[in-house]
């Protein structure tokens, strides 16, 4: 695992390498939830070496000397809501760090039973959308902010309509669309001042 991370860092001259984290769902998880795979985040693993602007810290190699030199730290503002890793890597990328993905350094994570509930998963997507919007819209005003709002609204409407249409025939696809709708609802709520809710106490 670590050898795969180091090999990717060398091959792609990367400062940060992200690898996939595969969820291990608990017994009793419905088949349609497993098929929707809501806890898996695809960063383009099928394109190893792809450059990205942000990522998550679940399976990551970071060049420590770069972090020390740039003096970048996690922002405690995101300590309870989550998103501090997303913010951290965005700031690294803005300072010139090279962030890439690899599909060879794989990790697995056991998912607690209470995190495969529909209500939790949809609320998680709302929170994720708020975090994304709060980060993406920092310093953004005027037409670009309006364009972001219109984009989120259109995606919300399309995803909601799709979820309703697919529910009778494809529960997995319908749920994926519900998650997409929830994420865009979170983005819109952030535009009206909503802050990410605490993910833990």
Report the location of each language-model feature.
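Active-site phosphate/pyrophosphate-handling residues
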Residues: 65, 87, 106
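Acidic donor-binding loop at a coil-to-helix junction in glycosyltransferase catalytic cores
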Residues: 79-90
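Conserved donor NDP-sugar-binding/catalytic core segment of glycosyltransferases
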Residues: 1-32
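Residues that recognize and position ribonucleotide moieties
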Residues: 53, 60, 100
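Conserved nucleotide-sugar donor-binding
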Residues: 56-71
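Active-site donor/metal-binding and catalytic loop motifs
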Residues: 76-80, 97-119, 131
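Non-catalytic, C-terminal membrane-associated alpha-helical segments of glycosyltransferases
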Residues: 123-130, 137, 141-201
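Short, flexible, basic/aromatic active-site loop/helix in glycosyltransferases
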Residues: 19-20, 34-53
């Amino acid at each position: 695992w670590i050898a795969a991370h180091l090999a990717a860092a060398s091959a792609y001259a990367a400062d940060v390498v992200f690898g996939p984290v595969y969820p291990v769902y608990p017994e009793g998880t419905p088949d349609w939830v497993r098929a929707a795979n809501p806890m898996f985040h695809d960063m383009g693993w099928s394109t190893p070496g792809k450059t990205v602007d942000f990522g998550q810290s679940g399976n990551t190699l970071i060049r420590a000397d770069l972090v020390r030199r740039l003096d970048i730290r996690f922002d405690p503002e995101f300590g309870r809501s989550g998103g501090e890793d997303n913010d951290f890597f965005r700031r690294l990328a803005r300072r010139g760090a090279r962030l890439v993905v690899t599909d060879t350094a794989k990790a697995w994570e056991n998912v607690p039973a209470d995190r495969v509930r529909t209500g939790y998963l949809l609320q998680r997507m709302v929170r994720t959308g708020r975090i994304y919007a709060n980060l993406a819209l920092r310093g953004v005003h005027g037409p670009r902010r309006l364009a972001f709002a219109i984009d989120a609204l259109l995606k919300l409407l399309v995803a909601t309509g799709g979820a309703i249409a697919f529910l009778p025939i494809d529960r997995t696809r319908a749920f994926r669309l519900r998650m997409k709708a929830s994420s865009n609802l979170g983005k819109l709520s952030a535009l009206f001042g909503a802050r990410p809710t605490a993910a833990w106490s």
